[in-house]
């Protein structure tokens, strides 16, 4: 065998599984704190304003196609560094071109070293993000020196360190290519584990050769970076799980306490779902399956979703009884699956209109030759038996299905099914949105740092909250996340989302005392809630289920805020900080409206301590209430 025993290319890029409205930082059921293995947030981001001052030669670059321009940026900024372009570049709905690069060393990836370039509608460089490694590098390739362990030892190392219930006693190694392997004959994981030899830039500024061991455990889908020499040492871990007629609680009804069920006819948006929700363009279905999603019961928590039960009606009447006092949950499983299918498809259609399209890496089986990789609807598991009091979403790279698991919550009697809390479904689906947009559709490992992971939680809460706004709401409206499933008026966040600093005192520097992504996410959503109301106060609020555009810009403040936040996800660097994400939102507004909302945005950020003087340090963030002179 030449070189190494190794496994499956870009396909093995990790998937992000995000669990949550209920805070959980442990490897499910194994008692391992994954926070201890999070990657450091080490990206830099140069905004359009900063680039004009500090890199005018880059700012003025243009000519050729956007890929050539982006490649030239990387060459000029990182001379002598080897890299490859990731095959997921695209032109977004706002006219910004996004190109992604991965640093290489001796023909292998440095797996957490990325560079993203954003090209504006005028063909000039808008901004870029960078986490390339610049310290001393090894002289010789490890393949030449054979300076690494057998990959099987790495699998055992990951299993031991993370207490994974994987049996590999009879496992064999199948070589996929020079640097990647698949572990055959294991049990305990939902699919065959994979291994990839790659470098990892460590927090101390050195480079480690690692085996990246990928294991899908269901509620956790892990990429474990095991030291290639000392396989008892795990450097970092990425977790991908972060987590007709339809009788449903229609949007924006958030839960059974705030509205009544209704029978909706053909609720899809044909621009976003031209095959409707129950066809993929090749096959028509009479069940909860289509181009965007497939929904079913999953009582045993297993992975055989295709053969699981789902409601079926040849007349396409998905109308089933449900009331909050019904018990046990299985007695209303048809209504649960239908509600989950409805909510997830509504999210798909809305996000599509805001820019999460095929080429941006959305979740669809059939991409209609519109770009991106198809074959990846969202698997929706209702009443999932693998846990309680939670929900999660697994986000693999584009072309592999996302997976949402929603559980029964036992904090009330009778127990409550989180399919019926729209905020839970929106929050989880938004993990898929943010992980596909940040760093590009082929890289699902960009939100695994503490601050970036916190923003992943905050974005989920932000979109869930914005969608549930009521017609009579004004900036004095307060919203609690997860109150129904938790059976608590406090929900599952520290404070309500509010524009009042008395009701919600969280500011940027509050993050200094938190070491948990949901707490940090609450701070981020609190900041975005200020953005939301500043833009609504300026542009009004569209209470309809879809935005109305004028020249590509939402006409109202609610959907404009959602659009700018979504565009910012695609612009920001891999593993962003609050400061970098703030700058990306400002750049998104500069691109979309020529900066018409600059002062509204700055005032919102500054109110919560993310003004012009804010600085990131993981242990000692500096807050600022300053705004640019023109906004004073």
Curated annotation (Swiss-Prot):
Which of this chain's residues carry glycans? 284, 591, 620
Q: Which cysteines are joined by disulfide bonds?
A: none
Q: Which residues form the signal peptide?
A: 1-19
Active site annotation, chain numbering = 428
Record text on cofactor binding: Binds 1 zinc ion per subunit.
**Pfam families, A to Z:** FTP, Peptidase_M36
> Which family is it part of?
Belongs to the peptidase M36 family.
Protein name, entry field: Extracellular metalloproteinase 1
Q: Which organism is it from?
A: Arthroderma gypseum (strain ATCC MYA-4604 / CBS 118893) (Microsporum gypseum)
Source gene? MEP1
């Amino acid at each position: 065998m030449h070189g190494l025993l190794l496994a499956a290319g870009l396909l093995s890029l990790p998937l992000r599984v995000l669990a949550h409205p209920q805070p959980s930082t442990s490897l499910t059921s194994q008692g391992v704190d994954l926070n201890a293995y999070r990657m450091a947030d080490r990206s830099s981001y140069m905004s359009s304003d900063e680039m004009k001052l500090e890199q005018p030669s880059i700012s003025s670059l243009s000519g050729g196609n956007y890929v050539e321009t982006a490649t030239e940026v990387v060459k000029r900024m990182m001379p002598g560094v080897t890299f490859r372009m990731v095959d997921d570049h695209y032109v977004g709905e706002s006219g910004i071109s996004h190109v992604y690069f991965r640093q290489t060393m001796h023909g292998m990836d440095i797996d957490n070293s990325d560079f993203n370039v954003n090209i504006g509608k005028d063909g000039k460089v808008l901004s870029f993000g960078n986490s390339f490694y610049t310290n001393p590098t090894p002289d010789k390739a490890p393949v030449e020196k054979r300076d690494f362990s057998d990959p099987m030892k790495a699998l055992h190392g990951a299993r031991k360190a993370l207490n994974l219930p994987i049996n590999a006693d009879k496992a064999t190694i199948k070589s996929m290519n020079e640097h990647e392997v698949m572990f055959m004959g294991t049990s305990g994981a939902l699919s065959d584990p994979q291994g990839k030899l790659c470098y990892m830039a460590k927090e101390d500024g050195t480079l480690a050769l690692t085996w990246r061991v990928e294991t899908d455990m269901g509620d956790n889908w892990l990429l474990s970076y095991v030291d290639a020499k000392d396989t008892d040492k795990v450097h970092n871990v990425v977790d991908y799980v972060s987590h007709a007629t339809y009788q449903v609680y229609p949007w924006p009804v958030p839960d059974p306490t705030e509205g009544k069920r209704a029978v909706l006819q053909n609720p899809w948006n044909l621009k976003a779902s031209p095959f409707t929700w129950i066809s993929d363009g090749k096959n028509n279905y009479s069940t909860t399956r289509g181009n965007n999603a497939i929904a079913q019961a999953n009582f045993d928590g297993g992975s055989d979703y295709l053969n699981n039960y789902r409601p079926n009606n040849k007349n396409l009447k998905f109308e089933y009884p449900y009331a909050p006092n019904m018990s046990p949950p299985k007695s209303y499983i048809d209504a649960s699956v239908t509600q989950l299918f409805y909510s997830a498809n509504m999210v798909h259609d809305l996000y599509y209109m805001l820019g999460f399209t095929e080429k941006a890496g959305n979740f669809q089986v059939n991409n209609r030759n519109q770009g991106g990789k198809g074959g990846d609807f969202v698997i929706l598991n209702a009443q999932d038996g693998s846990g309680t009091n939670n929900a999660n979403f697994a986000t693999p790279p584009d072309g592999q299905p996302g997976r949402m698991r929603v559980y029964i919550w036992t904090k009330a009697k009778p127990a409550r099914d989180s399919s019926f809390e729209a905020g839970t479904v929106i929050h989880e689906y938004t993990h898929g949105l943010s992980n596909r947009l940040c760093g590009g559709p082929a890289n699902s490992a960009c939100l695994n740092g503490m601050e970036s992971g916190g923003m992943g939680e905050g974005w989920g809460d932000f979109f869930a909250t914005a969608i549930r706004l009521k017609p009579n709401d004004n900036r004095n409206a307060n919203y609690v996340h997860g109150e129904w499933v938790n059976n608590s008026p406090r929900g599952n966040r520290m404070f309500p989302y509010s524009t009042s600093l008395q009701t919600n005192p969280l500011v940027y520097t509050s993050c200094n005392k938190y070491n948990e992504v949901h707490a940090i996410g609450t701070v981020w959503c609190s900041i975005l809630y200020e953005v939301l109301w500043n833009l609504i106060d300026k542009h009004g609020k569209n209470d309809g289920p879809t935005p109305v555009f004028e020249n590509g810009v939402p006409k109202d403040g609610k959907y404009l805020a959602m659009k700018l936040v979504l565009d910012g996800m695609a612009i920001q660097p891999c593993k962003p900080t609050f400061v970098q994400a703030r700058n990306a939102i400002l750049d998104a507004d500069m691109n979309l409206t020529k900066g018409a909302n600059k002062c509204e945005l700055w005032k919102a950020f500054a109110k919560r301590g993310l003004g012009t003087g804010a600085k990131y340090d993981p242990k000692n963030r500096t807050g600022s209430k300053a705004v640019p002179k023109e906004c004073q």
